[in-house]
Amino acid sequence: ELDESVKVSYEHESQLASKPDFFGIGAEHFLELALREGEWVIRRDWYLDPLDVDAGSVSSGTALSSPFEIDVPYLPEILTATADSGDDKEYAYLYNRENAVAYADKYCGLAWGCGNNRKYNPLYENFTGLGGDCTNFVSQVLGDKEAGNLPMTYTWRYVPNGAGAGATRAWAQASSLLSYLLSSGRAERLARGTYSDLIAPSETYPGGAIGALNAGDLIAYEKNGRIEHFAVVIGADSGLYLLVNSHTADRYHVPWDLGWDCDTVFWLLKIVI
């Protein structure tokens, strides 16, 4: 394995005289080496391009599994419910946005700028090799006691060890988390549309729907009718452009639409509790 961490600087065209903004990206490479004429050379390199999330797996050999969906066999049989059972309605709580953002910065992984020595939180399984860790990371941001501190439920929880250890579908799968958040009332869909749709002024959102998100809110990414990715909103850059953190690939303070094409459908989700 080989870890890659990159710092990227950029400037807005309207602010070329100002100081540049920075974001970080990271990638984990799985290398196959071959000994040729007494020297080790790279024969194959499997990785996810952190600047082109929409491309999926990039490889010179056999592709990795889909980077965005965890296959059912990796999840405990007893924890596969996806519909909200109402078991979280009894709680009185508030989402801690400040801690959620701090957690997202601390545990965003290999990208430049991430904390914790650029390591994931060791208390949670890393699903990168099993299909992708983006949704697991967002669930941590929402529910870890160090982060947003939303109480786990039967439908949405992570069990670190013992009977039933593992993640529920709603915790680890993008489409299931989206369904859970909306059905449970923990999130509200502000808008769903392409980039052009979300930056266009409307009566409800004069500055565009994208401007209605705050730090700690979420964006889900849909391609061909399938929810493929999740990211957490961190804030905005000097040009007030929304920034996100994510896993698979690891991103720190990256512009929210970078790497996604004009056909991508974005779901803007506001955490409302």
Describe the role of every protein-language-model region.
Residues 240-251, 256-273:
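Low-complexity, Gly/Ser/Thr/Pro-rich intrinsically disordered linker/tail segments
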Residues 163-243:
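...with weaker cross-activation on analogous glycine-rich loops/strands in unrelated enzymes
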Residues 19-77, 242:
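Short beta-strand edge/turn micro-motifs at domain boundaries
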Residues 1-16:
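Surface-exposed, charged secondary-structure patches
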Residues 42, 136-140, 217-221, 243-245:
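Structural recognition of the beta-strand scaffold that forms the well-ordered cores
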Residues 21, 25, 92-96, 126-134, ...:
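Extracytoplasmic/periplasmic, Sec-exported soluble proteins
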Residues 8, 111, 224-228, 238-239, ...:
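Solvent-exposed loop/turn segments at secondary-structure junctions
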